[in-house]
A protein has these predicted regions:
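A conserved ligand/cofactor-binding region detector
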Residues: 1-478
């Protein structure tokens, strides 16, 4: 790879020693493995910056379809080794370190695992990002920049104890803060609607705003000069403070990007989880539409050029948020906005037990997200009307397929309703969804209703091959 500081062993050694001494104002012989890791990571990020920028420019130039992959987790692991290998510079660094008497493995182990994931959901998301970058596909991730990640476990006096995962206590050499792309996200308040010149005017009044600040991390493709982006959103004070206690406002907003999966057994915990989900979904969708409009000057072709991939139900609020932007801000008619929305969204389901499918109490949902609730309610009303028209004497079918029922908002039903592509994460998983847990939804819909929910059984496919799924999403034309 043509990276100036890594072109050969001699050049890299000189640049590396100089950078260590200049950054820390010490003799190189006195540098620690951690200091060497920081300099190595920063040098690599600096050298792949041109590829990163060129990847963005080439996507714009080609007017290519772009996937925005939303997940509450990205279990990335240590990135330094993978990045060195994908950039094609690992052999140069290894030989240079051997000649300098540095143990590369020890330097690699100075990196703290990014506290962005906990299990299979996050590992799948991380594999997606690595694979699609290596395939040269324009796919960019969205997540929260959790300060403390999940938690670390230990044993004390024979008992398990948990500690915060302070993965950001040291420098994150990969991230770049992008203040200019910050977004302010509203919570609470109430909605005032009126008509002006035949157009619906919606105003969110008395809202409590939180600023979402993006931090970008490069995802380097395997020896192909492609660098995609994982964007992490951090919660900070908005430009206008709410008319409440400032200390309480700061405490609550800091919690949004504090940790992965806060305890939701309490009312406050439920509010925080729903806040987290809307926070990064709204910021990511707004940002994606801004980028799209800079290139195409319109949102009417959004479904031809953008896909929002919903990784499990946590980002399912993409559906009403996209509708909100298209109807309230872009002033599209509902039917046109809904057509665009359901041709933009793809959904991966990770849960096979019906009782574990994510649901939100209606009162909490409507209080925290008043406009999103109104839109979700309208999606549900229209869908139920169509089911009712087909099965006028069978209310059980209507109830079993409803997005909102019995005081709950069913997020999996919402994601399926708007998804042009729905899949499980394994063949068995998908079969269980089709024939057991979501059987009522799938088997009771005719071809007309399948346009709204899924193309009958064919809309479900297993996640057998990351490449095939992403190619299908990128090549999809409604």
């Amino acid at each position: 790879m043509n990276y100036p500081n890594f072109k050969d062993v001699k050049t890299f050694k000189e640049a590396f020693v100089s950078n260590v001494e200049n950054k820390y104002a010490i003799d190189f012989e006195c540098s620690t493995p951690y200091q060497q890791y920081v300099v190595l990571g920063e040098m690599l990020r600096y050298n792949i910056a041109k590829d990163w920028h060129n990847t963005i420019l080439e996507t714009k130039k080609q007017k290519a379809k772009v996937v925005y992959y939303f997940s509450m987790e990205f279990l990335m692991g240590r990135m330094i080794t993978n990045n060195l290998m994908n950039a094609g510079v690992y052999p140069v660094v290894k030989q240079a370190f051997d000649e300098l008497g540095i143990d590369l493995n020890e330097v690699e182990h100075q990196e703290t695992d990014a506290g962005l994931g906990n299990g299979g959901l996050g590992r799948l998301a991380a594999c997606f990002m690595d694979s699609v970058a290596s395939l040269g596909l324009p796919v960019h991730g969205n997540c929260i920049r959790y300060r403390y990640g999940f938690f670390e476990q230990g044993i004390r006096n024979g008992y398990q104890v948990e500690h915060p995962d302070r993965w950001l206590k040291d420098i994150n050499v990969w991230e770049i803060r992008k203040d200019e792309e910050s977004v302010e996200i509203p919570f609470y308040g109430y909605i005032d609607m009126n008509s002006e010149n035949g157009k619906l005017q919606v105003e969110h009044k008395n809202a409590e705003y939180v600023k979402a600040v993006p931090y970008d991390i490069p995802i380097i493709g395997d020896n192909n000069h492609i660098v995609n982006t994982l964007r992490l959103w951090s919660a900070e004070p908005a430009s206008v403070y709410p008319a409440t206690d400032a200390f309480e406002y700061h405490r609550k907003l800091r919690e949004i990007s504090s940790m992965l999966y806060p305890n939701d057994e309490t009312e406050e915990g439920k509010v925080l989880r729903l806040k987290q989900q809307y926070f990064f979904v709204s910021a990511g969708v707004i940002n994606a539409i801004r980028r799209h409009k800079k290139i195409f000057k319109t949102v009417k072709n959004l479904d031809k050029k953008v896909v929002f991939h919903i990784n499990d139900t946590h980002p399912a609020l993409i559906v009403p948020e996209l509708m909100r932007i298209l109807v309230d801000e872009e002033h599209l008619e509902w039917d046109e906005a809904w057509k665009i929305t359901k041709n933009c969204c793809a959904y991966t389901n990770h849960t096979i037990l019906a009782e574990a499918l994510e649901k939100w109490p209606l009162e909490l949902f409507s209080r925290l997200l008043p406009r999103i609730y109104q839109i979700t309610e309208e999606i549900n009303r229209r869908f139920q009307n169509e089911i009712q028209a087909k099965y006028p004497d069978n209310q059980d079918k209507v109830k079993s397929m409803a997005i909102i029922y019995d005081g709950q908002v069913k997020m999996a039903h919402l994601a399926i309703a708007a998804g042009f592509s729905v899949n499980g994460v394994a063949r068995l998983h998908t079969e269980i969804l089709k024939h057991q847990e979501l059987k009522e939804i799938i088997l009771r819909l005719n071809m007309i209703m399948a346009i709204i929910y899924m193309f009958l059984l064919n809309k479900y496919h297993r996640l057998k091959n990351i490449m095939l799924v992403m190619q299908k999403i990128l090549n999809y034309l409604p």
